[in-house]
Curated annotation (Swiss-Prot):
Cellular component terms per the entry's GO annotation: extracellular region
Keywords, sorted A to Z: Cytolysis, Dermonecrotic toxin, Disulfide bond, Glycoprotein, Hemolysis, Lipid degradation, Lipid metabolism, Lyase, Magnesium, Metal-binding, Secreted, Signal, Toxin, Zymogen
Reactions listed under catalytic activity: an N-(acyl)-sphingosylphosphocholine = an N-(acyl)-sphingosyl-1,3-cyclic phosphate + choline; an N-(acyl)-sphingosylphosphoethanolamine = an N-(acyl)-sphingosyl-1,3-cyclic phosphate + ethanolamine; a 1-acyl-sn-glycero-3-phosphocholine = a 1-acyl-sn-glycero-2,3-cyclic phosphate + choline; a 1-acyl-sn-glycero-3-phosphoethanolamine = a 1-acyl-sn-glycero-2,3-cyclic phosphate + ethanolamine
Pfam family, one: GDPD_2
Predominant subcellular localization, coarse grouping: secreted
Propeptide, residue positions: 19-26
Protein name: Dermonecrotic toxin LiSicTox-alphaIA2ai
Length: 306
């Protein structure tokens, strides 16, 4: 009889600990933060930035004259202290990214949960934006999502620099629907990265028929200084009852003082060349009880409620 009682007590203890852990996890009121590794354009850089503490990356995407996504390439000029010329063929990068974000793959990085594609649509005419979205969707579906069969699990943000290129969003969505995978739009978010007036950004989303899954970026190269006025406008919109923004991120943040300022302004993400710097600040006594590094269980389209 005693062995059975002992077994029951052990099981009860394990279940109690699990329940307590679950409650503590759900009770965590700290703001989740996405640490975005900046300008990750070579496959080898994926591991490099994740190992430094990034849980998300930003990748540049250039287009050819026919609106096909061609390379993961930034070019000169770029951030101070960085090599501007690293690149991959876009589809090769997608395959490498898929390996890094597919559970069970030998190259899987569990911490990598979100990818921002900085779409260099400045080389395109306005009337090519819809076609660019369609071609981007086809490439992602085949080479990243593996045609919907156990592809990469990371959330994707399509970051567009020009408000006039909002038809890219519709083209992307229409192509996924046409190819039989509209459910993948659940994994896709949006950003306009041109530092336009917040009201103008909202109007562009209305034209695109988008409500939800909205990240709002603000920033400038690390070679220059930029204040946080527009960041505060974006966070005010996010926190208002009728705002259209779900998350706000600031770029490029490489210094501890700038990181603290951004966190104090209430951002959800910080784009950086030095993820370890951001991690260090998050561990400081003034911030570790207010913020935490986001995990895959954190919905990147959900507005954080204090």
């Amino acid at each position: 009889m005693l062995p059975y009682i002992a077994l029951i007590l052990v099981c009860w203890s394990v279940l109690s600990q699990a329940a307590q852990t679950d409650v503590e996890g759900r009770a965590d009121k700290r703001r989740p933060i996405w640490i975005m590794g900046h300008m990750v354009n070579a496959i080898a850089q994926i591991d490099e930035f994740v190992n430094l503490g990034a849980n998300s990356i930003e990748t540049d995407v250039s287009f050819d004259d026919n609106a096909n996504p061609e390379y993961t390439y930034h070019g000169i000029p770029c951030d101070c202290g960085r090599s501007c010329l690293k690149w991959e063929n876009f589809n090769d990068f997608l395959k490498g990214l898929r390996s890094a974000t597919t559970p069970g793959n030998a190259k899987y990085q569990a911490k990598l949960i979100l990818v921002v594609f900085d779409l260099k649509t400045g080389s395109l005419y306005d009337n090519q934006a819809n076609e660019a979205g369609k071609k981007l969707a086809k490439n992602l579906l085949k080479h990243y999502w593996n045609n919907g069969n156990n592809g990469g699990r990371a959330y994707i943000v399509l970051s567009i620099p020009d408000l006039n290129h909002y038809p890219l969003i519709k083209g992307f969505k229409d192509q996924l629907t046409q190819d039989g995978h509209p459910e993948l739009m659940d994994k896709v978010g949006h950003d306009f990265s041109g530092n336009d007036a917040i009201g103008d950004v909202g109007n562009a989303y209305k034209k695109a028929g988008i409500s939800g899954h909205v990240w709002q970026s603000d920033g400038i190269t690390n070679c220059l200084l930029r204040g946080l006025d527009r960041v505060k406008q974006a966070t005010a919109n996010r926190d208002s009852a009728n705002g259209f923004i779900n998350k706000v991120y600031y770029w490029t943040v490489d210094k501890r003082a700038t990181t603290r300022d951004a966190l104090d302004a209430g951002v959800d993400g910080v784009m950086t060349n030095y993820p370890d710097v951001i991690t260090d600040v998050l561990n400081e006594s003034a911030y570790k009880n207010k913020f935490r590094v986001a995990s895959y269980e954190d919905n990147p389209w959900e507005t954080f409620k204090k």
